Amino acid sequence: MSWQAYVDDHLMCDIEGHEGHRLTAAAIVGHDGSVWAQSATFPQFKPEEMNGIMTDFNEPGHLAPTGLHLGGTKYMVIQGEAGAVIRGKKGSGGITIKKTGQALVFGIYEEPVAPGQCNMVVERLGDYLLEQGL
């Protein structure tokens, strides 16, 4: 399966039990900041934004004072899982980022999608990739 198929079929799909509800944008990005696959709506990010995200995975709490920035959008960092998941909130939407051995899985959402639904979609794929050694 191509990386694009993972984004299209496992991240940008309808959320279980909520037909028509789906993430706003999603991507799989290597630890080095190279995009493996992304939805057409995923924001163009700056290298320093990706560096900040990677630093927060290695040093949990790094982004808390400044917020998480992606594509020029600032998210308030909320509870995640140190070294494994970063979650952010902005207005009625937010972001979930799951770290795997080689990549970061991104999901961005807006209402009516709930934070927990985004977490479920992103973390399920991230856990699967971890199980595959990726």
From Swiss-Prot:
Oligomer status and interactors: Occurs in many kinds of cells as a complex with monomeric actin in a 1:1 ratio.
Among PANTHER family, the record links this protein to: PROFILIN (PTHR11604), PROFILIN-5 (PTHR11604:SF25)
> Mind telling me how this protein is modified after translation?
Phosphorylated by MAP kinases.
S-S bonds = C13-C118
Q: Which residue ranges does the UniProt annotation give for the motif Involved in PIP2 interaction?
A: 84-100
Main location as per UniProt: cytoplasm
- One Pfam entry for this protein is Profilin
Which domain of life, per UniProt? Eukaryota
Family of the protein in this entry: Belongs to the profilin family.
Q: Which GO terms describe its cellular component?
A: cell cortex; cytoskeleton
Say what the protein does: Binds to actin and affects the structure of the cytoskeleton. At high concentrations, profilin prevents the polymerization of actin, whereas it enhances it at low concentrations.
Name of this chain's protein: Profilin-3
Protein localization: Cytoplasm, Cytoskeleton
Q: A Gene Ontology molecular-function term?
A: actin monomer binding
Q: Which InterPro entries match?
A: PFN, PFN_euk, PFN_sf, Profilin_CS
Going by the UniProt record, its keywords in alphabetical order are: Actin-binding, Allergen, Cytoplasm, Cytoskeleton, Disulfide bond, Phosphoprotein
Any extra remark in the record?
The variability of the residues taking part of IgE-binding epitopes might be responsible of the difference in cross-reactivity among olive pollen cultivars, and between distantly related pollen species, leading to a variable range of allergy reactions among atopic patients.
- Origin species: Olea europaea (Common olive)
